[in-house]
Amino acid sequence: MIGRLQGILLEKQPPEILLNVQGVGYELLLPMTSFYDLPEIGQETTLFTHLVVREDAHLLFGFAQKTDRTLFRELIKTNGVGPKLALAILSAMSVEQFAYAIEREELSKLTKIPGVGKKTAERLLVELKGKFKGIKQSDFFVESTHIPLSPSIESHSESSSDEAISALIALGYKPAEAEKMVKRVAKPELTSEQVIREALKAAL
């Protein structure tokens, strides 16, 4: 199994990237919380990975931190949570935010994530509560301050908004809902990654 990849970032179109590892291009799906940490196109990056084998496809998921992958693996063990839903959960919340929501039994916050209904949220609480006791409350809701203004992504409002809407749809949001979320936060100076981040933050 592929557990870790180190290579040159060739393309990034949230939530997908193309990574060149010694001449081989790997397509990976990343949660947005990991996507924000990516370097500029053409630079080297290292990602922890998880391979999902299905009858119709092999899907490779990438994560900036090992803790993100660990939570992803815990999520897909939960009945009713597949890889795509786990990706949506990790895109909407950091590991710390998710842990905080679980420990405080914040069902309403979990059900705001696309694809997470009341029953799924209740299952997550039952199966994952108590697994995050080592995390301090002061660690929760830490703002990321290192999202670069990437010249590889159009900074024009229309282009950034279109890319952000496409990414949100890929994460499970309905087209009309994704468009509404983006319009609420879009600004001309923001990259698509920043628009996605602000839209997801505002949705919770």
UniProtKB/Swiss-Prot annotation:
Residues spanning the signal sequence: none
Annotated spans, Domain II: 65-143
Pfam families listed in its UniProt record: HHH_5, RuvA_C, RuvA_N
Gene3D superfamilies cross-referenced by the UniProt entry: 5' to 3' exonuclease, C-terminal subdomain (1.10.150.20), DNA helicase RuvA subunit, C-terminal domain (1.10.8.10), Nucleic acid-binding proteins (2.40.50.140)
Keywords: Cytoplasm, DNA damage, DNA recombination, DNA repair, DNA-binding
Chain segments carrying region Domain I: 1-64
Family: Belongs to the RuvA family.
Function: The RuvA-RuvB-RuvC complex processes Holliday junction (HJ) DNA during genetic recombination and DNA repair, while the RuvA-RuvB complex plays an important role in the rescue of blocked DNA replication forks via replication fork reversal (RFR). RuvA specifically binds to HJ cruciform DNA, conferring on it an open structure. The RuvB hexamer acts as an ATP-dependent pump, pulling dsDNA into and through the RuvAB complex. HJ branch migration allows RuvC to scan DNA until it finds its consensus sequence, where it cleaves and resolves the cruciform DNA.
Record-given protein name: Holliday junction branch migration complex subunit RuvA
Organism of this sequence: Haemophilus influenzae (strain 86-028NP)
Gene of this entry: ruvA
